[in-house]
């Protein structure tokens, strides 16, 4: 593996670990019911993963419930939900047994993306995120999508020795419409339900996200080659299940 890829992977893992430790220091038993509901929905959504055509990575609708959680949950709970969601997406029904560093990178990338999205949205709204839930979801989504896509695209490009621009282009071709639909649904739910009851809207929304998953799964299956060419090196298989 190129030294640049190793350095980048290490940087992301260390950054994600520090954020998890920071969030753990703020733990409190408040809003445990809402926390467990968002945690369960995000974990279930993470199992609905789709392989991105032309890339060695997967995507899932877990981000929808992360965005809704950013309206009602404190920072540490959003980080915890992000961590569990990423672990489920990496480990559940993987095409091949993932390596520890691969799982750690995927988890760190999701934690970083959700943390930056949460902090940006609440900074812009000056702590009034719950008062403007739709705006909070839109702001958070506008950060989560590009950051997460860039982190995943960059590691794939570095590991496989490909230019970043075409890797990002392939990623956005599939991820962008998926995210836009999810953000639209999340914004709709956050606008209909009060911040304290957005979790009810999240429960109602879950079947819709399952149908969205089925649609994109069938669409991506038609775009995937019937047989995958053998990899020329172990490095090209290294991040076969990178999550986005």
Give short role names for the model-derived ranges.
Residues 1-58, 64-170, 174-217:
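Short helix-perturbing small/polar motifs within transmembrane alpha-helices
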Residues 162-167, 219-244:
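Membrane-proximal helical linkers
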